[in-house]
């Protein structure tokens, strides 16, 4: 495991302070009222955190995957929805970074430089295309100097608030995975219709929207890469995203563990703090062990991505699976440690438990990530 640089340490100290002072006090309200974290968006923009992977060539800070993973862990510790804001922002930018032409990058990436508050989204999931993304029904037909897109997407994070959306659609359905293309779509494009924002179990401070495309015309120059390269582009983005999901999950688990530990030291039963009870000690020990193991695996995956190592896909899938399962288990155990208090909203752990569930689902369910891991090991 690499030692953190002084710059990374300073960034983390700053993020930890912001998370504790500015983000944590707002977490309960975001959850209860299902509010989009506009305050965090504006604050991150001023601090240079909203677009951490934006290349320096386009005015960005280009922090790297490991640094962003560390940031997401700190944010996830106090408010998973706010961490998801940065993950969604990165999701909509990575496809352009990975596959966009120099002209496309110049036209769009530079808009996110400085203190820009513009938001992005990635639109791939459909009602009939979740784990099986090749089942998507959205179509893009070339007509002269434009593409006409028809179809719909669902559960799109940042969907209704994004200024720039990367949309995946079939340009040649007969070619399967090599028939999918990706397009940059701007907010306000005629034919882009917004459906409902979903009411969710957890991560309620994040917006997930339905999007409909009704003869939506997109300039041909807005295609990302060549026709048919969209699926490979999407897989590359998801491989990176899984590490960020893992980091977020580690943060959620750490936050719940911190609350549980404090409670065991303060809560007195049978004449002494419950920290003295062996069953409680065993629970906390297992929780802490799982959190630290997940943290180390996640950081290893992030380092491999930064190094361009081919094993990053394998480690990213393992990290996402382990960290999200850990988050679900640790938050559930934290509720148990707190007992009746844990079931009440004011203590935060029940929110963390609801938030943790999503980490087992998005960027590929844990069943899918186990398949990715198994295939990478058995069919290298």
UniProtKB/Swiss-Prot annotation:
PROSITE patterns noted in UniProt: ACYL_COA_DH_2
Enzyme Commission number(s) of this protein: 1.3.8.10
Record-annotated active site: 91 (proton acceptor)
Binding site for FAD: 122, 124-125, 131, 157, 365, 367
SUPFAM superfamilies recorded: Acyl-CoA dehydrogenase C-terminal domain-like, Acyl-CoA dehydrogenase NM domain-like
InterPro entries assigned: Acyl-CoA_DH_CS, Acyl-CoA_Oxase/DH_mid-dom, Acyl-CoA_Oxase/DH_mid-dom_sf, AcylCo_DH-like_C, AcylCo_DH/oxidase_C, AcylCoA_DH/ox_N, AcylCoA_DH/ox_N_sf, AcylCoA_DH/oxidase_NM_dom_sf
GO molecular function, one term: acyl-CoA dehydrogenase activity
Pfam families xref list: Acyl-CoA_dh_1 (PF00441), Acyl-CoA_dh_M (PF02770), Acyl-CoA_dh_N (PF02771)
Superkingdom: Bacteria
UniProt binding sites for cyclohexa-1,5-diene-1-carbonyl-CoA: 131, 178, 242, 363, 375
Catalytic reaction(s) noted: cyclohex-1-ene-1-carbonyl-CoA + oxidized [electron-transfer flavoprotein] + H(+) = cyclohexa-1,5-diene-1-carbonyl-CoA + reduced [electron-transfer flavoprotein]
Induction entry: Expression is 3 orders of magnitude higher during growth with CHC than during growth with benzoate.
Keywords: FAD, Flavoprotein, Oxidoreductase
UniProt binding sites for cyclohex-1-ene-1-carbonyl-CoA: 131, 178, 242, 363, 375
Cofactors that this protein relies on: FAD
Function according to Swiss-Prot or TrEMBL: Acyl-CoA dehydrogenase involved in the anaerobic degradation of cyclohexane carboxylic acid (CHC). Catalyzes the 1,4-dehydrogenation at C3 and C6 of cyclohex-1-ene-1-carbonyl-CoA (CHeneCoA or Ch1CoA) to cyclohexa-1,5-diene-1-carbonyl-CoA (CHdieneCoA or Ch1,5CoA). Also able to catalyze, at a lower rate, the dehydrogenation at C3 and C4 of CHdieneCoA to benzoyl-CoA.
UniProt subunit comment: Homotetramer.
Family note: Belongs to the acyl-CoA dehydrogenase family.
Name of the protein: Cyclohex-1-ene-1-carbonyl-CoA dehydrogenase
Organism: Geobacter metallireducens (strain ATCC 53774 / DSM 7210 / GS-15)
